């Protein structure tokens, strides 16, 4: 069965695994999902991610994300929200890039220069599609 919105599926898997205090979560691989995982890692929301090749008899690579928790199992991801959806795309110019929780969170932007955070896109002076907010 095909997936209508793979990024929403990824964010939902992350949110659910985080709420259940799982150590890791696996999902089907795509370059876009790897880019989102890379941003989450560089911003400190996850520990790491790993791309595994399919075993014999399986189809497609798998992306495994290792979640990050504090000393007393405090969640590093308080919330995740999908902004631009297949039925309603949301774009922003570099002058109108959103601030998530006054700069405490991060907006993931798909630009002509690849996936960037709202801060990186603002520094480079590029706008794009606002994929998600993470805080």
Swiss-Prot record:
Keyword field? Ribonucleoprotein, Ribosomal protein, RNA-binding, rRNA-binding
Q: Which Gene3D superfamilies match?
A: 3.30.1370.30, 3.30.1490.10
Coiled-coil ranges per UniProt:
none
Q: Which Pfam families does the annotation name?
A: Ribosomal_S8
Q: Name one GO biological process term.
A: translation
Single GO cellular component term: ribonucleoprotein complex
* A GO term for molecular function: structural constituent of ribosome
**Subunit field text:** Part of the 30S ribosomal subunit. Contacts proteins S5 and S12.
Q: What does this protein do?
A: One of the primary rRNA binding proteins, it binds directly to 16S rRNA central domain where it helps coordinate assembly of the platform of the 30S subunit.
> What is stated as this protein's family in its record?
Belongs to the universal ribosomal protein uS8 family.
Q: What is this protein called?
A: Small ribosomal subunit protein uS8
Record organism: Nocardioides sp. (strain ATCC BAA-499 / JS614)
Which gene codes for it? rpsH
């Amino acid at each position: 069965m095909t997936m209508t919105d793979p990024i929403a599926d990824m964010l939902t898997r992350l949110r659910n695994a985080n709420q259940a205090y799982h150590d890791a979560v696996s999902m089907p691989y795509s370059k876009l999902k790897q880019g989102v995982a890379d941003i989450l890692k560089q911003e400190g929301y996850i520990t790491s991610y790993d791309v595994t090749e399919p075993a014999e008899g399986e189809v497609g690579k798998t992306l495994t994300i290792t979640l990050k928790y504090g000393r007393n199992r405090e969640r590093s991801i308080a919330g995740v929200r999908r902004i631009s959806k297949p039925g309603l795309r949301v774009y922003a110019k570099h002058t109108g890039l959103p601030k998530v929780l006054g700069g405490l969170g991060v907006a993931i932007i798909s630009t002509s220069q690849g996936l960037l955070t709202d801060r990186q896109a603002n520094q480079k002076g590029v706008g794009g599609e606002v994929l998600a907010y993470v805080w």
